[in-house]
Amino acid sequence: MSEAIASKEERLVAYNANIAAADKDPSLSPETGKPLSKVNTIRFGAGFLVFGILWMSGLGIVSAVLLPMHYKTIEGADPDALVGIVNAFTAVASLVSNLMFGNFSDRSRSRFGRRTPWIVFGAVLGGVTLFLTGTTHNAVLLTIFYCACMFGLNCMIAPLVAVLSDRVPSGIRGTMSAFYGAGSTIGAPIGTMIGAFFIENLTVGFAVAGVLMFLGGIVAVIILPKERSADFLPKEEGSFKDILVSFRPPKFAGAHDFYKAFAGRFCMLMSYQMINVYQLYIIQNYIGQSVKESAVTVSVVSMIMMVMSLVGSFISGPVSDLI
């Protein structure tokens, strides 16, 4: 029976049956209960790859190059101190928004699916506020816009990452994760190289960054196979208190792998960002290069990082599926 004429009850039964079948057979999609076609496999891989490249390129333009330069234009501000203050606020915004939008998308029951509307909304919010970050010379407004950008970014990331468990067979999730990881890893140095090109034209650079982040969510939705309607799923019952409780992290006793992955990723990103965020200041203030010289150095370093990231990402995904 086609989805168009099936009742909501029949669609719910089929939905649960598909998930049960996929739990037993790693080649089956939890969404359809069938193996992915070659075309859809390619579309998932391409969608995750392009999404990672675009949003990370947009953010990389700003975080690694343009924003450190922009801090120097704010009268009376200490750029070094401002980097730490703004990043502290955006770190909190990222943590809260990732949990929040992941939870909200789980509870969505849209005819466009649970994830798609949030990805589109996040693309608009993230792109617009990333551009606005470069239009103000007020430290408070800048922090507000940049935090809003983190909300938009995580409004895309949390639902899109959930697509892996919602729609992709477990047997190829490692490979698909590698496509996303490769995209975001490649996107960072690409963004830095683009940012170096606009190091003396900040406003245009911020506009390009905003467009790239916006396109990240929109293009991903277009490339990925169309998400099925979620209007047949039963609504999540509960009070506001129940919603708050749902944000609680899992207990350590039953989630060892979660906390191992969390700790590993936290340490990896912290060590990377310790250098990346202050990279431009290190090159200009410690090494002593001019603005134009530092742009060339940033581009060369980014090219090296991109090549090595490509090699690592495309090896790790398939290997993880075999283990």
Question: Locations of the language-model features?
Answer:
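Helix-to-loop junctions at the C-terminal end of transmembrane segments
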Residues: 98-112, 312-323
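Residue-level signature of mid-helix packing/kink "hotspots" within the transmembrane helices
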Residues: 91-95, 99, 188-189, 306-314
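Symmetry-related core transmembrane helices of the 12-TM Major Facilitator Superfamily/SLC fold
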Residues: 121, 204-222
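Cytoplasmic helix-loop-helix junction between adjacent transmembrane helices
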Residues: 148-183
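Juxtamembrane intracellular "pre-TM" segments in multi-pass secondary transporters
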Residues: 3, 9-42, 227-263
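C-terminal ends and interior cores of transmembrane alpha-helices
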Residues: 120-137
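Helix-loop boundary and gating motifs at the non-cytosolic
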Residues: 26-91, 259-264, 268-288
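Glycine-rich segments within core transmembrane alpha-helices of 12-TM secondary carriers
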Residues: 90-95, 174-197
